[in-house]
Amino acid sequence: MMRWFLLIGLASAAATDSSASFESRCQHFHKEIHLQNVHVHSTTYVPIGSNISMAYNPPICGGTSSSSISTIEFCQVALNVTTSDKSQFFMEAWLPSNYTGRFLSTGNGGLNGCVGYGDMIYASQYGFATIGTNNGHFGDTGQYFLNNPEVIEDFAYRALHTGTVVGKALTKLFYPQGYKNSYYLGCSTGGRQGWKSIQRFPDDFDGVVAGAPAFNFVNLCNWGSRFLKITGPPDSDTFVTSAQWSIIHNEIIRQCDALDGAVDGTIEDTDLCQPIFETLICNSTAVNKTSCLTGVQANTVNEVFSAMYGLDGKWLYPRMQPGSELAASFIYYSGNGFKYSDDWFKYVVYNDSNWDHSTWTLADAAAADAQDPFQISTFDGDISGFQKAGGKVLHYHGLEDAIITSDSSKAYYKHVADTMGLSPSDLDQFYRFFPISGMGHCSPGTGAASIGQGSSTYAGDDPQDNVLMAMVQWVEKGIAPEYVRGSKKSIDGQTEYRRKHCKYPKRNRYVGPGKYTDENAWKCV
């Protein structure tokens, strides 16, 4: 018995010594950082069970208060990196004591200038040395772009790339073994950033997990401006109310839900969904015209679900996929301008903070498209550099996305295939795309859409349930994901059912014999 107590005591002492050594290493780490254009604010030791400090996070990004309790021991490094005489970005590097030899960079969202702390918490728990930047400015607004192309360049690509270079250097300094593999995790603008790295800096990452990417970014901004032109303001005869959009949604589900073989309230393949809205036009005897559509309103809805073309007839951006209208009615169809599109035109295209979004026309679309600063559109179809570097990319997009249509991801996949002359099986060697039914914008919707892309969608560490772990397995073991399994969560966080989401261009089909909640009752066809 005495021997067991002695062993336990020795183990406890070793753990204490290890923590003390790690704490000391962290507290003195700033003395070792001598990187060009880098100013270190602090290196802070964060023990298990402590509140994670966000001391440099401004109120516009949520402020300095944090309700996150650290489940790991890590060294939190805060610093600024100068990119020009008119621009700089803030970044943090989290260096965990449970380090696995993996480096990971996180992305941003919207016109976001806020560090993705949620993703940093998620990745560092897995032992990744993790970084996040503010992408060149603080806050979720484009006003910092006004008359400052250097800040736009940081936002387009430079902050992520430079932050990755700095982050890798810090990782090598802190850990004697350096890093074995580098990864990226991001969604929305973060998805675009991941793809920009693939296109422009193919050696930055071995594995990229990119969700709902803001591909074709400038025309995405044009697309966001176009909806006000289609719907008109709330007092116009073309406007469709949120209550009517609910009716429209029910009609879309009625027409399209069963196309995949199961009636479950979720559309598995939006390409098959081509709804006819004339079924909702009020008849001549209708008393309550708010429960149906006028002919003019039906035309509005048809336009909403149509692709955007330029003045010269050139395709600019795909349609909004059906199934997203309940959320989109408050984002795009509310009779107001879309904030991100509004900011892009005010502070980038025209450098005029008084520009009125209600004046937008296809001529403005042409001006913005021609400008495309620093190729921010991120629509290059040749990713052969990434292929040759041995990189892998797992691309996903929710089929209920109400901010960035999933048709944009399908268009990009086809663009890559056409540009590189590769078949789906050829692309599978390094690029796999998974449309996720029942997923909204980077987050769950009506279906089995928790796929482990972040803490809020955690569904286990098994690679089939976790896109980050699936990428690690692909890069390090050569086992590529054949499907992504999503979980449908109840309000209390319990798993109601799971579904395997197919690798594009295959689609999910219910074949039975079990219920639609049985993951084995579905087949990729």
From Swiss-Prot:
It comes from Neosartorya fischeri (strain ATCC 1020 / DSM 3700 / CBS 544.65 / FGSC A1164 / JCM 1740 / NRRL 181 / WB 181) (Aspergillus fischerianus). The active site is at S188, D401, H441. InterPro entries: AB_hydrolase_fold, Tannase/feruloyl_esterase. Keywords: Calcium, Carbohydrate metabolism, Disulfide bond, Glycoprotein, Hydrolase, Metal-binding, Polysaccharide degradation, Secreted, Serine esterase, Signal, Xylan degradation. One of its GO terms (cellular component) is extracellular region. This is Probable feruloyl esterase B-1. Glycans are attached at N51, N80, N98, N283, N288, N351. Gene3D superfamilies: alpha/beta hydrolase. Residues 1-20 form the signal peptide.
